Amino acid sequence: AAADPLTDKIGQNVADFLAADMKRGIIPSTFLPLQSGVGNIANAVLGALGRDKTIPAFEMYTEVIQNSVIGLIREGRIKFGSACSLTVTNDCLEGIYNDMDFFRDKLVLRPSEISNNPEVVRRLGVISINTAIEVDLYGNVNSTHIGGTKMMNGIGGSGDFTRNAYISIFTCPSVAKEGKISAIVPMVSHLDHSEHSVNIVITEQGVADLRGKSPKERAQAIIENCAHPDYKQLLWDYLKLAGGKAQTPHAIQALSLIHI
């Protein structure tokens, strides 16, 4: 599917965040290898990074390479792509075969034991960017199940990269089902990536930097920066109801109301 204003905004927020981290010296001026998930949001993120000339041409160390990566290699915005799977359209694949002299020193496919190897991911300082279905107030991520029961997709290699990345980012729209459901929830209905692995949450609303924050500080950052305005007050009310004395406040009796 083509990009739309919502996914474009998420992509731009990711690009702005990475450019800001580079300016602060957290990311070196030469940049770092990126891992990207698959789908519309991932393509929008890569598109935004390709357009943002404050970010230098970069490398991909990822699991799956899609059409968008090939396009950015042709444009010179991606210098090199390493993956274990080339998942592109037939036309794109034919274009690669027809231009093999150009691509032979710009693409490599490795076994997943290498492409997803935790030590390699950590040593290279990979920045991981993956898509969430829902994120809770403390930074736990559900990336596979709708309502905690219906599988949308598998976890793929996102766990390998998220847990070992230099910076781990999750993106999602702030709402689903035409605004009827908030993607920012008090507690995820299914857990794929825990708060200990998630550094940054980005929606079309903004960026929540969770690094170095306590659970309550993470909750405040996520509500303020990532939640949709229609659901912010509800989430603040939940946090207040959960009480202020616990390390990670929850009001279990109220959770079912959020997911209905």
Regions found by a protein language model. Name each.
Residues 2-95:
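N-terminal active-site beta-alpha-beta segment that forms phosphate/nucleotide-binding
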Residues 19, 29, 131-136, 141-149, ...:
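Non-transmembrane, aqueous-exposed alpha-helical and coiled segments at domain scale
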Residues 53-67, 140-171, 193, 225-234:
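Gly/Ser/Thr-rich active-site loops/lids in small-molecule metabolic enzymes
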Residues 65-135:
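Ligand-binding beta-strand-loop-alpha-helix segment within the catalytic cores
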Residues 120-129, 146-155, 161-198:
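Structured beta-strand/loop patches that form or line metal/cofactor-binding pockets in enzymes
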Residues 193-241:
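A hydrophobic, small-residue-rich beta->alpha segment in the mid-to-C-terminal subdomain
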Residues 258-260:
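Conserved small/polar residues in nucleotide/adenosyl-binding loops
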